[in-house]
Amino acid sequence: MGKTRNDDWRKVNYMEIIPYESRYAEDFRLLNEAWLEKYFVVEPYDSELLSQCEDIILKPGGFIFFIRIDSEIVGTAAYIFKSKGVYELGKMAVDPVFQGQKLGQKLMLFMLEFAQKNHWSKIILYSSRKLKNALYIYQKNGFIEVPLEPNLPYDRSDIKMELNLK
């Protein structure tokens, strides 16, 4: 099948960034469980999101994207709908075998462009100061630290960041 103009937005160098399809649900779960288990534990809310991503992320208005190299899914990120124009960036992971190739940065740039094209007002995220590389990418892309609210969705979170798009 030939390349169409609509495919251009997905191409980033040698990789493709593609939207969610149900056949990639297991990749979404496994990629995220790998980094969660490496640095933390898989919390109950994580398990819900990862095992029911269509119901909890997509149906309420969220989005999931994947990095595909050849036919292999090697990275993912999600936007979780919070309120009109406000989304939480989360569940961002790159397979350890493919880390160090700036795939996370390329995925982040795609995610930011997607938010801007959709005229969102704000992106929020929750992270941990333990994830220095992730925090560097967030700060490099304009995210700033904001106060944490009570009743956080994740026990591991000790930092909240946001990026105002308007």
Please provide the spans of the model-predicted regions.
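Conserved N-terminal entry element of GNAT/NAT acetyltransferase domains
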Residues: M1-R23, L165-K166
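Intrinsically disordered, low-complexity regulatory regions of eukaryotic regulatory proteins
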Residues: R5-N6, V86, R156
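C-terminal "cap" of GNAT-fold acetyltransferases
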Residues: Y14, Y20, S121-N141, V146-K166
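Conserved glycine-rich acetyl-CoA-binding loop
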Residues: E72, D95-L109, N118, R129-Y136, ...
